[in-house]
């Protein structure tokens, strides 16, 4: 029993968090649709990154996230297109999956509202950050990289790669190290490894490229705009 709990601990925790969110009343989650009132878009010359700068700033303050990071995610997900749909069903500027949005009682049609879409994406980002359970000594860049990757592919893949790195006595909280182990999860030798719970990761290179792209765009936005 102890071995089972040790191996599947993170999956049990993630399932519990998902179920808990589904049953918490909307007003107890801090999500208030009244707060998502329409804001006029900024005109050229009034914004630094996008016409949605004010919305990004407001929502980022609410959730204690760098607004420039949210902008970088939006750029990489949709080029700031609030009407974007992906072939896999992701919706809106931040490409939120409808089944994820339902955890916060947000319907698919509501995800076309930029403010609601950004807010749900921000909540998802923060929930991924909590699932990854970073020690205090982990650098902000590494925290950001792991969380961005989780936003793209889910936290379980990242946890598998970290566990694999730890098995081979590599630092499991350094992105530049663990990213190599993420790539290995496409290989049968490694996705069947005792340290791995989630099975094969078929397109790990996409997550690596996505994460590095978001980090690059974020660094550009940091040089352009103040926090």
Task: Give the ranges of each region predicted by the language model.
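Non-catalytic cell-wall polysaccharide-engagement segments
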Residues: 2-34, 46-47, 63, 102, ...
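Short extracytoplasmic
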Residues: 38-66
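Extracytoplasmic
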Residues: 51, 65-70, 75, 88-91, ...
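A generic alpha-helix surface/boundary motif
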Residues: 53-54, 94-95, 99, 123
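Cell-wall polysaccharide-cleaving catalytic domain and substrate-binding groove, primarily
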Residues: 76-93, 97-100, 154, 214
């Amino acid at each position: 029993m102890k071995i089972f709990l040790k191996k599947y601990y993170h999956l049990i925790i993630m399932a519990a968090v998902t179920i808990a969110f589904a049953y918490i009343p909307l007003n107890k989650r801090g999500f208030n649709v009244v707060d998502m009132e329409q804001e006029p878009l900024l005109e050229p010359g009034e914004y630094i990154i996008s016409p949605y700068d004010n919305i990004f700033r407001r929502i980022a303050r609410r959730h204690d996230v760098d607004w420039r990071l949210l902008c970088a995610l939006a750029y990489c997900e949709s080029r700031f297109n609030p009407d974007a749909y992906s072939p896999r069903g992701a919706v809106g500027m931040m490409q939120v999956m409808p089944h994820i949005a339902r955890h916060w009682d947000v319907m698919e049609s509501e995800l076309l509202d930029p403010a609601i879409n950004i807010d749900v994406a921000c909540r998802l980002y923060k929930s991924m950050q909590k699932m990854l359970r970073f020690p205090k000594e982990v650098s902000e860049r590494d925290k950001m990289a792991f969380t961005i990757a989780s936003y793209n592919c889910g936290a379980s893949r990242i946890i598998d790669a970290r566990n694999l790195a730890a098995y081979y006595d590599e630092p499991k909280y350094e992105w530049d190290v663990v990213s190599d182990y993420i790539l290995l999860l496409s290989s049968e030798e490694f996705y069947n490894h005792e340290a791995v719970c989630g099975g094969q990761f078929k397109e790990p290179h996409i997550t690596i490229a996505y994460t590095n792209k978001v980090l690059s765009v974020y660094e550009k936005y940091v040089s352009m705009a103040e926090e």
